[in-house]
A protein has these predicted regions:
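C-terminal segment of N-terminal export signals and the immediately downstream linker at the start
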Residues: 20-62
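Structural beta-strand segments of beta-rich domains
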Residues: 72-76
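Short amphipathic, basic-aromatic surface patches that mediate peripheral association
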Residues: 79-88
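Short coil-to-beta strand junction motifs in C2/discoidin
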Residues: 88-94
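Exposed aromatic-hydrophobic patches
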Residues: 118-127, 153
Length: 159
C-alpha cells in the first residue's frame, strides 16, 4: 500500500466514523419518530367524549366566558392539551394562534428549550358588528414540531 492510498483510506474511514457517530447522537437526542400523516391537514379531536392520548396532549384547550358584552374586555386562555404539552429540544409547541372565525387576533411563538409552558392569554374586546347573530366562534390553532397543526373551536355569545 502506498502512502496516498493509506492517507485516503484513513481520511474516508475517519469521516465515515464521524458521520455515523453524529447520526447516532442525533437519534439519541431526537428519539421520537414523526408521523407524516399528521402534517397533511389540520388535526382535530375526532370524538370529543373519547379523546386519544395524542388528542389530549395536542388539541388546544380554550377557556373563555360563555357570554360576553360587546365592547367590554374579557380574557381568553389557550393551553395546549388537557394535560399541558411538555416542551423540550426534541418535542415542542412552535406557536399558539387565536382567531374569531377567519379573523386573526394574536399569535404567541415558543422556543424549544422549555423555558415556557405552551399557554397563552389573550385580552379581547369584541365590537357588536363582529357578532350580528349574537354568537362568535373562537378558533385556536397550535403547531407541534412532531405532530403537526391542531385546531379547536369554542362558540361564545355576544350581547
Amino acid at each position: 500500500m502506498n502512502r496516498r492510498t493509506f492517507l485516503a483510506t484513513t481520511v474516508i474511514g475517519s469521516l465515515a466514523t464521524g458521520i455515523g457517530s453524529a447520526a447516532a447522537a442525533a437519534e439519541r437526542y431526537f428519539p421520537l419518530k414523526v408521523d407524516p400523516a399528521l402534517f397533511e391537514s389540520i388535526n382535530r379531536v375526532k370524538i370529543p367524549g373519547k379523546k386519544s392520548p395524542l388528542e389530549m396532549s395536542h388539541a388546544p384547550l380554550i377557556t373563555a366566558p360563555k357570554s360576553v358584552k360587546a365592547g367590554e374586555l374579557f380574557t381568553v386562555e389557550v393551553s395546549v392539551g388537557e394535560r399541558v404539552h411538555d416542551m423540550g429540544p426534541a418535542h415542542w409547541i412552535e406557536y399558539i394562534e387565536l382567531a374569531i372565525g377567519n379573523e386573526p387576533l394574536g399569535r404567541i411563538e415558543f422556543q424549544p428549550r422549555g423555558f415556557m409552558k405552551p399557554k397563552a392569554t389573550f385580552s379581547v374586546v369584541l365590537p357588536k358588528d363582529v357578532a350580528p347573530s349574537g354568537v362568535v366562534t373562537l378558533v385556536a390553532l397550535q403547531r407541534c414540531n412532531l405532530h403537526g397543526l391542531w385546531e379547536s373551536t369554542l362558540d361564545i355569545s355576544v350581547g
